[in-house]
Swiss-Prot record:
UniProt signal peptide: none
UniProt note on tissues of expression: Brain-specific. Expressed in neurons and rather enriched at synaptic junctions.
GO biological process: evoked excitatory postsynaptic potential
Name under which the protein is recorded: Brain-enriched guanylate kinase-associated protein
Keyword hit for Acetylation: no
Organism: Rattus norvegicus
Upper lineage: Eukaryota, Metazoa, Chordata, Craniata, Vertebrata
Subunit organization: Interacts with DLG4 and DLGAP1 and forms a ternary complex.
Compartments where found: Cytoplasm; Membrane
Membrane topology, as annotated: Peripheral membrane protein
Phosphoserine modification, residue list: 219, 248, 265, 284, 364, 391, 474, 484, 494, 496, 519, 521, 525, 571, 581
Ranges of biased composition (kind: Basic and acidic residues): 554-563
One GO term describing the cellular component: postsynapse
């Protein structure tokens, strides 16, 4: 037991030293661990600070991005709303355009149908117009042919009465005569001539002008132009003034109206004697020219239209039968062709070369210079167309060939008391011998005067013819004049038709200028032109006397069957006869058919008035 006591001590000392070493080692580990913990804590704190700063930055960036996103989102929303609005507008416009397109398509189809229908109607109308134009042209030609046949018919003595005409045609005739300044015959004068209408007036009413021709519209103005030009440049004949004659054709058989519209007396003062130069012929007397110049108004005796460029008139009588254009017509009427001038000059030479019969002109001092003999009738029948011309010598008379009977209007002798067979034969004979003859030929014939110093009025003839004779003076002792009833009735009819010598009456103005040196006397029964015979049928004939006033003795006739219209006495001491140039004597061209038509018209009128 003692031995055991020492051992626990030593064991206790050994255990405490080992524990001391273990405690120091643990103390060291504990300090090292504490260092590591502080380092880690410090590091963690740094990391936490960095994390906080980073999170703060990210939060700021996030807010900024959020704001930008919001802005972009708003923009997109506005853009989307605008787009939707535009889509709606576009849809509406598209719908509207579609509807308009549909409407226009329908209208286009409807208008296409209408165009097709209108084209068909236009084609039908064109065909109808063409047919109507052809029918109208045929009707116009037929009407003009009827009017021409009416003027050229053989019934020259036919008197048309207003009461026998249709009612509508009566109105047309009345309007035509009122328009052109004439009137129907008065039943108070002579009942046999009352209610009668001249054939030429009926023909004028029936005739239809060509719508494509301007000649009917321009003929009046061109005729007036020619009249003024002839009165100004060539102081000679002129168209008559309306106051010179009666207002209608009734002057020839209405002696009761002789005091109305009478021409002025010979005693009227004359202010311009030389205006009417060579009215009757180159042998006409000065006093006669003075008296005729006094019968016209002052306006016609003055050169009122100096330098007025006038054109030759174009006849409207054949306007509806004209197949040429207006340019060709005016070109033909502007000047004489070479062939016509040659024919005219040849005619003058042949006519002037003929000799008058010595028995007829032997006692006339005015024809002392003329030759001795006249050609045979066969030679006279070969006379060219233009028989009457102006003598180039003052003392030489007109030559009038024997063929002039065939050249005068047929009605002048168709009313004579002879068998109808002879009249028909004469008509057939003259139809083949017509020449360019105007009514101025008839109007140019002068009659022996029955009373000296009286005005040249157409009523002077009617006073004798219907009133029981005139003066008892010898026709061979009275001066010639232009008081022929043919001349007066022609001038009156020219105004009654209202054309002022424009429709073919100026086809031969040389006969107006030449005047009427050809007197009608009963002594020349064998002369070319048979005269008028009254209803008594005594057989007296009024031949063509180829001498001037007082040139040859003639038998006296006091009965009212002798035609003795008064004229104006004149003396050859005033001024010498004038000489006309060929241009004055033949200023008109291309009038063969026109002159014939006008001559037939006037001849029918004379037959109606003097029947």
């Amino acid at each position: 037991m003692w031995t055991g006591g020492r051992r626990p001590g030593r064991l206790r000392r050994a255990a405490s030293a080992a524990d001391m070493e273990k405690l120091s080692a643990l103390q060291e580990q504990k300090g090292e661990l504490r260092k590591r913990l502080s380092y880690t804590t410090h590091k963690l704190e740094k990391l936490e600070t960095e994390f906080d700063s980073t999170r703060h930055y990210l939060e700021i960036e996030l807010r900024r991005a959020q704001e930008e996103l919001d802005k972009v989102t708003e923009k997109l929303r506005r853009i989307q709303s605008n787009y939707m609005a535009l889509q709606r507008i576009n849809q509406e416009l598209e719908d509207k355009l579609y509807r308009m397109g549909q409407h226009y398509e329908e209208e286009k189809r409807a208008m296409s149908h209408e165009i097709v229908a209108l084209n068909s109607h236009l084609l039908e109308a064109k065909v109808t117009i063409d047919k109507l134009s052809e029918d109208n042209e045929l009707y116009r030609k037929d009407c003009n042919l009827a009017a021409q046949l009416l003027q050229c018919s053989q019934t020259y003595g036919r008197v048309h009465k207003v009461s026998e005409l249709p009612s509508d045609f009566q109105q047309r005739v009345s309007l035509h005569m009122e328009k052109h300044g004439c009137s129907l015959p008065s039943p108070l004068c002579h009942p046999s001539y009352a209610d009668s209408v001249p054939t030429c007036v009926i023909a004028k009413v029936l005739e239809k002008p060509d719508p494509g021709s301007l000649s009917s519209r321009m003929s009046d103005a061109s005729a007036r132009d020619l009249a003024y030009r002839d009165g100004v440049e060539n102081p000679g004949p002129r168209p008559p003034y309306k106051g010179d004659i009666y207002c209608s054709d009734t002057a020839l058989y209405c002696p009761d109206e002789r005091d109305h519209d009478r021409r002025p007396s010979v005693d009227t003062p004359v202010t311009d004697v030389g205006f009417l130069r060579a009215q009757n012929s180159t042998d006409s007397l000065a006093e006669e020219e003075e008296a005729e110049a006094a019968a016209f108004p002052e306006a016609y005796r003055r050169e009122a239209f100096q330098g007025y460029a006038a054109s030759l008139p174009t006849s409207s009588s054949y306007s509806s039968f004209s197949a040429t254009s207006e340019e060709k017509e005016h070109a033909q009427a502007s000047t004489l062709t070479a062939s016509q001038q040659a024919i005219y000059l040849n005619s003058r030479e042949e006519l002037f070369s003929r000799k008058p019969p010595s028995a007829t002109y032997g006692s006339s001092p005015r024809y002392a210079k003329a030759a001795a003999t006249l050609g045979s009738p066969l030679e006279a029948q070969v006379a060219p167309g233009f028989a009457r011309t102006v003598s180039p010598y003052p003392a030489e008379p007109y030559r009038y060939p024997a063929s002039q009977q065939a050249l005068m209007p047929p009605n002048l002798w168709s009313l004579r008391a002879k068998p109808s067979g002879n009249r028909l034969a004469a008509r057939e004979d003259i139809r083949g011998q017509w020449r360019p003859l105007s009514v101025e030929d008839v109007g140019a014939y002068s009659y022996q005067a029955g009373a000296a110093g009286r005005a040249a009025s157409p009523c002077n003839f009617s006073e004798r013819f219907y009133g029981g004779g005139g003066g008892g003076g010898s026709p061979g002792k009275n001066a010639e004049g232009r008081a022929s009833p043919l001349y007066a009735s022609y001038k009156a009819d020219s105004f009654s038709e209202g054309d002022d010598l424009s429709q073919g009456h100026l086809a031969e103005p040389c006969f107006l200028r030449a005047g009427g040196d050809l007197s009608l006397s009963p002594s020349r029964s064998a002369d070319p032109l048979p005269g008028y015979a009254t209803s008594d049928g005594d057989g007296d004939r009024l031949g063509v006397q180829l001498c001037g006033p007082g040139s040859s003795p003639e038998p006296e006739h006091g009965s009212r069957d002798s035609l003795e219209p008064s004229s104006m006495e004149a003396s050859p001491e005033m001024h010498p006869p004038t000489r006309l140039s060929p241009q004055q004597a033949f200023p008109r061209t291309g009038g063969s058919g026109l002159s014939r038509k006008d001559s037939l018209t006037k001849a029918q009128l004379y037959g109606t008035l003097l029947n």
